[in-house]
Amino acid sequence: VSGENLYLWKNYNGFDPDFVIMIAIAKVADDKFRKDMFKSKRKPIDEIWNGEHHREIGKIVRFTPSACNTQPWKVTAEEKSLTVYRYKKSGKRGIMPADKVAHYNRIDIGIFLCFLDLCLMENRIGFERELFTDNTKDDCEEVLTAKYTLL
């Protein structure tokens, strides 16, 4: 697809032509991957997962990659639901310039939702997901992103 055709297609289908991101997920050779993912530096489970339900999911999904290295997600877990928030701790911006953090945190939360879906499916937990639009300014600490009803 030529650049001009892609631009026209994106505009026709309602995509902002300046905002495109893609993530590839694939199985890689064992010798190309981290030997022990639990040795990587991530936020502790209690910092991102509120509640005692489904912690086995939280213990894995907390390893979701983060562009800003801020891991901007919080989950409130109940027996039959998960509520996901984009979380921005005041003064924390990771490796990104301050004016780019909100943009990349929105991308990070999308990647997190993908990993959360995959973890739920791997554990054979059925779900329905409701997504919420994030049009907030950068001054909000928690923004409702998704609600999962667990089946």
Language-model-derived ranges and their functions:
Residues 1-151:
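Acidic, surface-exposed loops and disordered segments
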